[in-house]
A protein has these predicted regions:
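Membrane-embedded alpha-helical segments of integral membrane proteins
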Residues: 1-14
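Internal/C-terminal transmembrane anchor helices
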Residues: 20-48
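Short, structured interface segments
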Residues: 36-42, 127-142
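Terminal, regulation- and interaction-focused segments at domain boundaries
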Residues: 48-63, 142-157
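A cross-family detector of function-defining hotspots
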Residues: 70-137, 149-212, 219-224
């Protein structure tokens, strides 16, 4: 972006020194100059869109922040005691949990919890809601069938988080990210700018005091 700006500045100087340049040419160059700087300013303020984080449960891929509940319903999943036509309301009282948190099951087997969020309005039918958060179940055996960004969770150990970078563990390469670590919690935040324009993603890993896994989670945050 800086190189584009420098190029435009040099072009303006060169053309203004030439008395034979048409006014329309100068106007075009001036417009290009302003456009490039407005673009750079917007990118500085809002950042760049990050790649969404996929979660795979058995043979089903869920794009957190994009996949609708109807897609999982079609593949045999259920959400708590709710049906496809049930009303889901987003109370907008929490920065992390949007809509309603419900247990997700398939063939009477729990696969954790998901937040279902209406889009464009405060209340909508469950089938129209977007999945904005996923948390793995407490049953460690279920991790064999779950992956985050195509990384099998059953293969991960606490030692991995103590010795490796989170972006390497989950095989992501974001341009903008932040890491928060304690003895038991490891959080990778992708897109640290305000999430008014672009979605922010968080991959969360929580361990018990004995080093065993408590849960993994993926969430998408978005104000619009």
């Amino acid at each position: 972006l800086k190189s584009i700006g420098k190029f435009v500045v040099l072009a303006i100087r060169k053309n203004f020194q030439n008395s034979h340049v048409y006014a329309s040419t100068n106007a075009f160059i001036g417009t290009a100059f302003l456009t490039s700087y407005v673009f750079m300013f917007c990118m500085m303020m809002s950042g760049l869109p990050a790649q969404p984080v996929p979660v795979t449960i058995q043979d089903t891929t869920v794009i957190i922040g994009e996949t609708k509940a109807s897609e999982l319903l079609d593949q045999g999943y259920t959400f708590g005691d709710k049906g496809a036509e049930s009303s889901i309301t987003n109370p907008k009282n929490d920065h992390f949990y949007y809509g309603q948190l419900l247990e997700v099951k398939r063939d009477n087997q729990s696969y954790g919890f998901m937040s279902l969020t209406p889009t464009g309005k405060d209340t909508d039918q469950l089938k129209n809601c977007v999945i904005t958060y996923y948390r793995t179940p407490k049953d460690k055996n279920q991790l064999e069938e779950i992956s985050i960004n195509h990384v099998k969770l059953a293969n991960l150990k606490l030692q991995d988080f103590q010795t490796r970078k989170l972006i390497n563990i989950f095989e992501v390469n974001p341009t903008d990210y932040n890491v928060a670590e304690t003895d038991a919690n490891y959080i990778l935040t992708i897109q640290t700018a305000d999430y008014d324009l672009w979605k922010r993603y968080r991959i969360e890993s929580k361990f018990n005091s004995d080093g065993s896994i408590d849960s993994y989670g993926v969430r998408a945050q978005h104000s619009m």
